[in-house]
Amino acid sequence: QRQMCIRDSPYSNNMLKRLVKTPKLYFYDTGLVCYLTKWSSAETLQSGAMNGAILVNYVVAEIRKTYLNCGKDPYMYYYRDKDAREIDIILEHDGVLNPIEIKKSANPGSELIKVFKLLDKSSAKRSKGAVVCMKPELSAIDRENYIVPVWII
């Protein structure tokens, strides 16, 4: 059975109570997304209002496909609370949470990872985090968080 869409659920547990619980919808094919939204060229997409959302869609789809191609279930969630604090992806593996933020920037700031601390209220352990972005090389923000170029995904 082939799927065209990904339904991403919010991460929740008893300690995190102020969640927005609406699921998110992503497409496996970003080319189809661009066609449906009438973004007809790379230049139009790059300067358009949806460029960040398309990048998030791409990264979510690629991470999910990587898990599925390895025969694993991707335990992928997102976090958004009523104060509009958001984590784009939370990967859960063996009870450990790995937060991922996605930004269409070549120089993401360390302020992006502050929201990761919200997961410390969870009963699950928080581990390494990442900011996936347009920076050309892999680097570290600090000992626990990395900057990952989108081309690595």
Identify the residue ranges that each predicted region occupies.
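Conserved beta-strand segments of alpha/beta enzyme cores
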Residues: Y75, K128, E144-Y146
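Short, hydrophobic beta-strand segments that form beta-sheet elements in well-ordered domains
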Residues: K125-C133
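Accessory nucleic acid-recognition modules appended to NTPase machines
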Residues: Q1-L97
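Short conserved micro-motifs at the rims of enzyme active sites and ligand-binding pockets
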Residues: T37-W39, E101, E111-L112, I141-R143
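Active-site ExK catalytic segment of metal-dependent nucleases
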Residues: E92, P99-N107
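Domain-level recognition of nuclease-like catalytic cores that cleave nucleotide substrates
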Residues: K135-I153
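Arginine/glycine-rich "motif VI" loop of SF2 helicases in the C-terminal RecA-like domain
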Residues: L68-N69, K117-R126
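Active-site-adjacent loop/helix micro-motif of nuclease/hydrolase catalytic cores
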Residues: A106-V115
